Design a protein with these regions (language model features):
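N-terminal acidic, proline/glycine-rich, low-complexity intrinsically disordered segments
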Residues: 1-5
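Amphipathic alpha-helical coiled-coil segments
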Residues: 57-77
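Short, charge/polar-rich alpha-helical segments
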Residues: 7-28, 40
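Short, charged, amphipathic alpha-helical segments
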Residues: 48-59
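Amphipathic alpha-helical binding modules
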Residues: 77-107
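Short amphipathic alpha-helical heptad-repeat segments
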Residues: 23-34, 62
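Secondary-structure edge/capping motif, primarily at the C-terminal ends of alpha-helices
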Residues: 35-46, 72
Length: 107
């Protein structure tokens, strides 16, 4: 009697999360750039329409970065975490997952 195997759906979700987590650095960089453009527009008193567009771009970039950060958390937990809540809770208590959770919540 060994450890239960994750479902095929859990495996698919895990692969998708690993792929998204791999782009986390690029997405964080894009969010930094979007924030910089937004702040520069505010500093130079740009028209409201431009500031709004840049704010929406920043929001989209931060949302993508946050999704990637939470995907990294789920990827660190592993595919069994999608099916087994006890396994997930145990993994959530590890330092690596704590660090990833803190990064995601910081966004």
């Amino acid at each position: 009697m060994g450890r239960p195997k994750p479902s095929s759906e859990a495996e698919q979700q895990y692969r998708a999360d690993v792929e998204l987590a791999g782009r986390r650095g690029d997405l964080l960089g894009a969010a930094r750039e979007a924030e910089s453009r937004f702040r520069q527009a505010q500093d130079r008193n740009a028209p409201d329409a431009e500031v709004r567009r840049l704010a929406e771009d920043l929001d989209a970039a931060l949302t993508a970065a946050m999704r990637a950060a939470y995907a990294a958390q789920r990827a660190e937990i592993g595919p069994l975490g999608y099916d087994d809540r006890i396994f997930r809770r145990k993994k959530m208590a590890t330092p690596a997952v704590h660090a990833l959770t803190a990064q995601a919540e910081h966004l």
